[in-house]
């Protein structure tokens, strides 16, 4: 089985080494094609106005000056043009990708691009806490990732579905189990705009995050609830985002 690994944290990110280790537990035919620079939050961005620069950093290891989407296309359509990959793994992201993160995540986008190309694809992310922010518990992903992937692959991933896996911020032996979940929703009040000024007094801005008190517990069955209970969250996400239920209502209203 030929496996293509990518991420959004960049070619030198610790999590990329983790996903490669997970991949090697499944196959010895592992290829890494990852962004030259950190691409966190770029979502499913595709480089159309800038050329892609490709650099071989080692055997079967390539850096692309582009997005995770660019990397998967470059890997599947150029580097591995002679024999396409059988599986795409994107991650392991430093930090969870749950709830609304799904829309912003370059990690998930890398897996989504694999799905678009007709390849079984998985996004993997490791949650951290304030205490483990500088040293996420990568051993949790290493310990549980291979077996979860084996079972999910055996189940047969539908062609238009990507699997989003999030590992809880706890030691491997503290993981409560594996839970198949749905995408959660959280209070977006933590987003803020931070205004600053440069040396000439001109304003510039950062999108930032601030800690807010958690009032309500996450809804049962969601990715958020699973991680809070120390479960590995496994969420099947569909490429087709059509709201079928509302489509019928809208058709009656507009028809």
Curated annotation (Swiss-Prot):
Where does the record place it?
Answer: Cytoplasm
How is its cofactor bound, per UniProt?
A: Binds 1 divalent metal cation per subunit.
Recorded hits in Gene3D superfamilies, A to Z, give:
Survival protein SurE-like phosphatase/nucleotidase
> What is this enzyme's EC?
3.1.3.5
Instruction: Write down the superkingdom of origin.
Output: Bacteria
**Similarity remark:** Belongs to the SurE nucleotidase family.
Asked if the Swiss-Prot or TrEMBL record annotates the protein with the keyword Cytoplasm, the reply is: yes
Q: Which PANTHER family match?
A: 5'-NUCLEOTIDASE SURE, 5'_3'-NUCLEOTIDASE SURE
Protein's name in the database: 5'-nucleotidase SurE
**InterPro entries reported for this sequence:** SurE, SurE-like_Pase/nucleotidase, SurE-like_sf
In its keyword annotation, does this UniProt entry include Nucleotide-binding?
yes
């Amino acid at each position: 089985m030929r496996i293509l690994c990518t991420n959004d944290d960049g070619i030198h990110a610790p999590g990329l080494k983790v996903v490669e280790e997970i991949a090697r537990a499944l196959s010895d035919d592992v290829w890494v094609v990852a962004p030259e620079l950190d691409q966190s939050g770029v979502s499913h961005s595709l480089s159309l106005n800038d050329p892609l620069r490709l650099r071989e950093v080692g055997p079967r290891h390539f850096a692309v000056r582009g997005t995770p989407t660019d990397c998967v296309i470059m890997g599947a359509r150029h580097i591995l043009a002679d024999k396409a990959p059988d599986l795409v793994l994107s991650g392991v992201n430093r930090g969870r990708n749950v709830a609304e993160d799904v829309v912003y995540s370059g990690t998930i986008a890398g897996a989504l691009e694999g799905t678009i190309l007709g390849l079984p694809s998985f996004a993997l992310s490791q949650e951290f806490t304030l205490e483990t922010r500088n040293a996420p518990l990568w051993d949790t992903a290493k310990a549980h990732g291979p077996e979860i992937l084996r079972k999910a692959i055996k189940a047969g991933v539908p062609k238009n579905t990507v699997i989003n896996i999030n590992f809880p911020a706890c030691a491997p032996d503290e993981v409560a189990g594996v839970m198949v979940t749905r995408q959660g929703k959280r209070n977006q009040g933590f987003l803020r705009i931070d205004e600053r000024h440069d040396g000439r007094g001109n304003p510039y801005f950062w999108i930032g995050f601030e800690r807010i008190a958690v009032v309500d517990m996450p809804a049962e069955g969601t990715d958020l609830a699973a991680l809070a209970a120390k479960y590995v969250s496994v969420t099947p996400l569909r490429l087709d985002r059509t709201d079928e239920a509302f489509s019928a209502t809208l058709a009656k209203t507009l028809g």
